[in-house]
Design a protein with these regions (language model features):
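N-terminal acidic, glycine/proline-rich low-complexity segments
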Residues: 20-169
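Bacterial Sec-dependent N-terminal signal peptides
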Residues: 1-21
Length: 169
């Protein structure tokens, strides 16, 4: 009887762990500067997409010169992902289609620091963060900062100055 009880306790303890779903993730990046770290990180993320639910890739200014090339670099990495996707799917069917990822590429704040935070300074990226948070999904949304956080700051500023501001933690 003790053995059966022990087995049942173990099953009850492990089932929630096995049932956990992927982590929701948005990445902010200053990709395209002189440091290749974000390109390397993005390639690594692409091969891990079976284990996370990517909800956005937001290019933004940090401290490097910002231009229109960031989205093209991101899309180049997604193109490379698309090339190897058939091989990745052989190992795990949960890899998302490249077009789904392309739709998540957004542009964030065009200037560094707090210069782009405040009234009328919303960006495609800050709006995307708000939209992702507002999804009907009980899982937490993780935001990985590979660059500055001013796009997230703008999203938080906007929500904190809206009718829902008192609910922002």
């Amino acid at each position: 009887m003790k053995k059966i009880f022990f087995i049942i306790v173990q099953l009850v303890a492990i089932c929630p762990v096995l049932a956990q779903s992927n982590t929701r993730l948005i990445v902010t990046t200053d990709i395209g500067g002189s440091d290749p770290d974000d390109i390397q990180s993005l390639v690594h993320l692409m091969v891990m997409l079976n284990d996370v639910d990517l909800e956005g890739i937001i290019s933004q200014h940090a401290w490097v010169p910002y231009g229109t090339g960031a989205d093209s670099i991101i899309n180049g990495v997604i193109d490379a992902y698309e090339d190897v996707l058939p091989n990745l799917i052989v190992h795990d069917k949960r890899y998302p289609d490249a077009n789904v990822i392309r739709e998540m590429v957004k542009t964030g704040q065009p200037q560094a620091a707090m210069a782009c935070v405040g009234e009328g300074k919303d960006s495609e990226g800050s709006e995307w963060i708000i939209k992702a948070v507002d999804k009907n999904d009980a899982r937490p949304l993780w935001i990985a900062a590979w660059s500055g956080m001013n796009t997230l700051a703008q999203a938080l500023w906007k929500v904190s100055h809206s009718s829902f501001g008192s609910k922002v933690i």
